[in-house]
């Protein structure tokens, strides 16, 4: 049971990281609004809290807690309209913290060539409003171990853990 909990926690971190990377791909430079400025303060606090926890006799439980607080705060604050700077700050902090534990090392990408071809074929089917073919291709992508999410910015594809 504890292994399943650990796997679910790691999956949550990968999902968040991959989502932030997707947002960053489509983000534009812009001024930080009130929401983003508040998030930047939370990023700073998470980094400081993480460092304090690790300095406290390697209190890994508290340090991991700071990572999850950051993810929670970022999930509330970030969306498709967030400026690059805010998204990049979250990714940088999350990557730095995760690096201490040697996690989040799996590359975030759209997968192998077969999966990329299926994704392109599905995008074409959707453009042609061929919903049956689109659904069939989605099922095939899912069967290969990927999670596909349709967003305003396009298809977001992540490897299932």
Residue ranges and their predicted role:
Residues 1-161:
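Structural preference for alpha-helix termini/caps and helix-kink/transition segments
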